[in-house]
Amino acid sequence: MASRPAGDLSAGEVPTRDIGPVTHSGVVLAVDIGGTKMEAGVVDGRGRIVVRERAATPTSDDPEQVFAALREIVTGVLGASPVPPERCGVGCGGPMGHGGETVSPLNIRGWRRFPLRERLADLCGMDVVVDNDAKALALGEGWTGAARGSADYLAMVVSTGVGGGIVLDGRLLDGTAGNAGHIGHVVVEPDGRPCVCGGRGCLEAEASGTAIAAATGRPAAEADESVRRRCGTMVGRAVASVANLLDLQLAVVAGSVALGYGDDFFDAARQEIALRCGLEFARPTQIRPGGLGADGPLVGAAAVARLGSGLVAGAGVVEDGG
């Protein structure tokens, strides 16, 4: 079912969206927009990418220049697709206005309250559903990835920035304005580095690719073992806080930094989780790499489109037969 208006919620009920099973058939247009790159693709009913294009995200302050780059790859995949998509799903960095009407990604300077949904709908001539990119990943990992079959989990992206999405009782948490799960701004070092949000010591300021490059003076991909392990420790600290708070026992972590740092990152994260999850219900908490690899952002965006169809019920995502 689709998100319900706040007025339809019982007192104290958290607004959520059911993650499945999804019965909507057919292909969808999937769009992922990040601070470093943007990508568009056509995805079928089993989560397979039929065609895709990507481009670097412009660093311009001009919102139209950023959208022009997006327009080029979207029109490219629509022209190359053997089957016309039925609807469009978008994963974009946050924060964003409720329902994804406007987006203000912290790592895309040119977009502040940019009307992305309306502009894409006008471009594509189809319904467009926009959500946070990490929440999109959470849907994708539950559909065909490392969280498939799990009803309670945290999904994270550790890349240019850090984001997250939370699924509890088989339902994706939205929150008041649709930004639930924004784990990048959980404080992991109270007197830590300044963050773009205005705070200090946020996970994104300590463990994102941007923060690591700024602190070391070289690309995050060239970080030595101590930096890779510190990144994992910071992420493990944040995961432990979420596990202790929400009684979930699985964190799935994707993104170029986390996956690129590999065992150094995940071993350090596991050690930190073991150190900080002392309560009996939290001790089994696991952290594992995302199962979708480089396809994760587009599969997640496709899951956003399929969820937006409204044809969902129960817990757990299933494949279409086509």
Task: Give each language-model segment a name.
Residues 135, 139:
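Glycine/small-residue-rich loop that forms an oxyanion/phosphate-binding "nest" at active or ligand-binding sites
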Residues 179-188:
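Short, intrinsically disordered, charge-biased short linear motifs at domain edges
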Residues 2-87, 97-100, 118-126, 140-150, ...:
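ATP-binding/phosphotransfer module of carbohydrate and carboxylate kinases, centering on a glycine-rich
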Residues 128-132:
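General beta-strand structural signal in soluble alpha/beta enzymes
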Residues 32, 89-93, 155-161, 165-167:
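Short beta-strand segments
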Residues 94, 160-162, 178, 201, ...:
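Glycine-rich beta-alpha junction loops
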Residues 101-112:
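A charged helix-plus-loop insertion that forms the helical arch/lid used to bind
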